[in-house]
Structures are given as C-alpha cells and as structure tokens.
Amino acid sequence: MGIHKLMDLLKEKAPGCIKTSDLKFYAGRMIACDASMAMYQFLATTSSASDFQIQNLTDKDGNKTGHLVGLLNRTVMLIENGLKPVWVFDGKPPQFKSGELARRQKAKDEAAEKQKTAIETGDMQEALKQEQRNLHITKEMKADAIKLLQLVGVPVILAPCEAEAQCAALAKAKKVFATVTEDMDALTFATPFLLRNLNSKKEPITEINYEKMLQELKLSHNEFVDLCILCGCDYLGRIEGVGPVNAFKLITEHKSLEKVLEHMEEVNKQSTKKQKYTVPSSYDYVSARDLFINPEVTDPETIQLEWKKPDVEELKKFLVEEKGFSEQRVTSQMEKVLNAKEHKGSQTRLNDFFKVQPKDTSSTSKASKKPTNTKSANKKGGKK
C-alpha cells in the first residue's frame, strides 16, 4: 500500500517537488530499484484471460516466468538508456508489520475464492482480476530473479528488512542517485529522490524531490513521518475520520502525533453525537515512527557496487534451456547491453560502463549487523 493517497496530497500541497522527465535525462545515474515491487507488477502485467482459462508465462514445468521477463526487459531498457540499476530485494518483514501482512493474506485468500467462482461461471475477466489480487512471490521465484540479474551483471542487494528502506539508505549515502519504486513510503524513509513510472521508455518519469517536498509542506522530517502514519501506512490501521488533507492540517497545526491524538480526544469528549475520530485500539504509532526513522538496513559504506559484463552463455543456459525463453530474444537483449550508450551525445566504452564504482566516503546512517548480503556486511542499527 505504501502511504495512503500521499501522491494526491503532494500534487495539491507541494506541486513544486514533482517534475516529469524523459528516461534519457538520467543517463549516467546509478539508481536503486525495489525488486519486490517490480516483480509483482511484472507478474500482473503478464497474465491474460482466454475464453476458458487464465494464461501466465511459464516454463516447461508450469512455473511462472513473467517476473523474469519483466526484470530482463526493464534492466536492459535502463542500461540501454545509460542508467546503472542496482536491484534491492526485501528481507524479512518487520515483526510490527505482521498485522498488515495478515490482512493482506486474508485479502488474497478471498481473491482466490472469488477467482474460483468466476472460473466456474465462465467470467474469465473477473477471474483474471482476482488472479492479479492473489499474486505470490515464492522463494524459488526470488532466487531465479537474483540469478538472472547476477548473470546480466548488475548489482543485487539482499536487504535485511524493507527494500525501500535500503534503497533510501543507499541514496542518502550518495551510493545511488535515487530510489525507484511505486511505493511512496520511500519518501518516509527520506530518499533524496524518488523515481516512479519507469514502466516504459515512452512514458515520462515522475521525480519527487524530498527536500523540496519538506520545504513546500513546511514540515520537518519527523513531522512528515507523523503525517505519513496519520494518512495510513503499512504498519498501522487508519484512524476513521482522517483523510490525507485532514491529516496534513492536523500535523501542521499540532506538529506531532502525540498532540494530534490529544486534540482528537478533546474533540471526541466535546461531541454530543457520534465520535468524530475513531482511533484503533492498538495504534502503536511510536513503534511505526521508529521503523521509519531508524529502519533496519545494511550500512551503505560496506556495500561495493560492481557492474560486470553479462555472462551470456550461462544466461542462455538458464533462460533458454531451463525457463523456455527464446534464444534469439535473449541474444538480442544481451547485444543491447553490450552496446550500451550514454544518451547525451557520447558513447560509453564497455569497460567504462562495467567498472567497479569507487568507495563513497559520504556520511551514512547506522544499520543492522545481521549479514544477509554476500557482497556486504550488515551493521545493526541505532538512530540515524
């Protein structure tokens, strides 16, 4: 879900922080991409409905491959346009998110039942709709995605927890320029730049500038975090009676969730009819706030980003022999990678493009000590 209707709020209250650009504008930039979010998108867009069944891209054993098709195409598109993608995968979800995960699982179970009913009645469009609400990323699918990206030669990072938080940490440490995800909570994790709508090189990219956003909203980072929690986030249920515009008004006036909740309590006491605000019984905003301000991430200073030449032969074995891809298609995509160009009039030599990036010595946040990435050591985190 991310942050409920945050984009709509920014369009109204902080339009100057949003701009659109062509993909070529970011040539030469390193970007951290939320792999988990992208995989769900790719699975959804590669499903279709026939008169009698739901059709998915699969290998010879019936395993879905739509996420691999999408990751390959997206990665090649970015490299071909001069960008340097880093793919970041989710680790374990925070324990505090268990309630939201349970809610999502219930929704998936309901979608599965509705899909079954739709198939029985022959309504394949409804069945497809419910199929897309019941998508799962298995461990095997994740492992295949990582293998694909490593064979293509791009860096892969296994985050200890939330991928968006790790992407934001990399961007704050200037290891990359921006976070690429559709989830608006990357801003709550304070990514300097958020890029959305990298779905096609034909569509403009939406860029959100974090510092300009705070300036236009006239909020500090902590106040913005409280605003996001009040709007509705993945960690907590929403307060009945509060929409994004009202949430912004309350935070602007009262500056913190503590003061907002005190105000709500007073308003409810004075109400002679139905209470205006209904706060969930387990509204642990303090823990939610801490997850945003002090997320569990790998220390960016321990991460070395390295772009390598693709292992074309191994990639063909994996995609063509195991996953049923067209050899011609794989060859064509790898030729695009090997012929990658900068898009500002100059051509980049292959050895320049796939070189080890120098270690960045810029400041970074504290993070988790738990080792989850083969190319980095994690450090457990204190306050940022």
Swiss-Prot record:
Segments for region (I-domain): 126-254
Function, in words: Structure-specific nuclease with 5'-flap endonuclease and 5'-3' exonuclease activities involved in DNA replication and repair. During DNA replication, cleaves the 5'-overhanging flap structure that is generated by displacement synthesis when DNA polymerase encounters the 5'-end of a downstream Okazaki fragment. It enters the flap from the 5'-end and then tracks to cleave the flap base, leaving a nick for ligation. Also involved in the long patch base excision repair (LP-BER) pathway, by cleaving within the apurinic/apyrimidinic (AP) site-terminated flap.
Chain intervals for the UniProt region annotation (Interaction with PCNA): 346-354
Protein name: Flap endonuclease 1
Post-translational modification as stated in the protein's UniProt record: Phosphorylated. Phosphorylation upon DNA damage induces relocalization to the nuclear plasma.
InterPro entries: 5-3_exonuclease_C_sf (IPR036279), Flap_endonuc (IPR023426), HhH2 (IPR008918), PIN-like_dom_sf (IPR029060), XPG-I_dom (IPR006086), XPG/Rad2 (IPR006084), XPG_CS (IPR019974), XPG_DNA_repair_N (IPR006085)
Record region (Disordered): 340-384
Family named by the database record: Belongs to the XPG/RAD2 endonuclease family. FEN1 subfamily.
Assembly notes: Interacts with PCNA. Three molecules of FEN1 bind to one PCNA trimer with each molecule binding to one PCNA monomer. PCNA stimulates the nuclease activity without altering cleavage specificity.
Gene3D superfamilies xref list: 5' to 3' exonuclease, C-terminal subdomain, 5'-nuclease
GO biological process: base-excision repair; DNA replication, removal of RNA primer
EC id: 3.1.-.-
Keyword 4Fe-4S: no
Keywords, in A-Z order: DNA damage, DNA repair, DNA replication, Endonuclease, Exonuclease, Hydrolase, Magnesium, Metal-binding, Mitochondrion, Nuclease, Nucleus, Phosphoprotein
